[in-house]
A protein has these predicted regions:
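Short, solvent-exposed beta-strand edge segments and adjacent coil->beta transition regions
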Residues: 6-10, 73-77
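Core segments of cupin and vicinal oxygen chelate
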Residues: 14-58
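Short beta-strand/turn micro-motifs at beta-sheet edges
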Residues: 1, 62-68
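Short beta->alpha connector loops
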Residues: 37-38, 61, 107-109
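Short glycine-biased active-site loop of nucleotidyltransferases that positions the nucleotide triphosphate
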Residues: 44-48, 66-69, 115
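Vicinal oxygen chelate
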Residues: 15-20, 72-73, 79-123, 128-134, ...
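Short connector loops at helix/strand junctions that flank enzyme active sites
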Residues: 51, 70-75
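Flexible, disordered linker segments and immediate boundary regions flanking tandem C2H2 zinc-finger modules
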Residues: 136-142
Length: 197
C-alpha cells in the first residue's frame, strides 16, 4: 500500500528578502497575498484555487545565504501553466517589461516553455501544454526537445512567439482525439443508462 496523496498542496521557499519575493510573485507573476504573518514571519500567496500555493520564509541571515546553483541537488524549477500560446506570449513580454532575463525557451512538442529565475535564483518555468498531451504522445515524446530563440529586454521578440502554434497537422490530431474522447464518454454514458437498476 502507498500513501494516497490527492495533490501537491503548496511550496515554501526560504528567501533572502520577503518583500522582494512578495513583489516579484504578485506584481510580475500574478499571485495574490492570502496572508502575512509579521510576528513569526512568512508570506502566503495563492493563485485563487487554494488558500495558499507558494509561501515565503525569511532567511534569518540573508547576507550569509547562498543562492541555488545550477547542477546542485535540490529544486530544479517550479512550473506554472497558462491556458494558451497567446498567454505564453503575453507572459514572455510581461517578464521582459519587468526586466526579467529569460534564460531559454523550449518546444517540448506537447508544450512550449520559457525559463527564468526569481530574485533568489530559484528556477521557474511558464508553459502552455497542448490539450490531450498524453494521448498525442502515448509512447512518450522521446528526446525531441527543440531549443527556441530568446531575446533580452529591448531586443526584437523571437518569431516563434507569433507562430500559429500548434500547426495544422497537430491541430487535426488534437481534434481527432477530442472527437474520439467525446464518443467514448457518450458510449459509456449510454451503457450506464441501458443497465437496469
Amino acid at each position: 500500500m502507498t500513501i494516497r496523496i490527492s495533490k501537491l498542496g503548496h511550496v515554501n521557499l526560504r528567501v533572502a528578502d520577503e518583500e522582494t519575493s512578495k513583489w516579484f510573485y504578485t506584481e510580475v507573476l500574478g499571485f495574490k497575498v492570502a496572508e502575512e504573518d509579521p510576528e513569526h514571519g512568512g508570506v502566503f500567496t495563492t493563485l485563487g484555487e487554494d488558500f495558499h500555493t507558494l509561501d515565503f520564509a525569511q532567511h534569518p541571515n540573508p547576507e550569509a545565504a547562498q543562492k541555488p546553483k545550477a547542477g546542485q541537488i535540490g529544486l530544479v524549477h517550479m512550473a506554472f501553466q497558462v491556458d494558451s500560446h497567446a498567454a505564453l506570449r503575453e507572459a514572455y513580454i510581461h517578464l521582459l517589461e519587468h526586466g526579467v532575463e529569460i534564460h531559454h525557451a523550449t518546444n517540448h512538442l506537447n508544450q512550449r516553455s520559457i525559463y527564468f529565475n526569481d530574485p533568489d535564483g530559484n528556477g521557474l518555468e511558464i508553459y502552455y501544454e497542448l490539450p490531450y498531451a498524453l494521448q498525442l504522445f502515448p509512447e512518450g515524446r522521446g528526446d525531441e526537445d527543440e531549443r527556441l530563440e530568446v531575446s533580452a529586454p529591448g531586443e526584437p521578440l523571437p518569431a516563434w512567439l507569433f507562430e500559429d502554434w500548434p500547426g495544422p497537422e497537430m491541430k487535426a490530431r488534437i481534434e481527432a482525439i477530442r472527437q474520439q474522447t467525446q464518443a467514448e464518454a457518450a458510449s459509456k454514458s449510454d451503457t450506464k443508462e441501458a443497465v437496469p437498476a
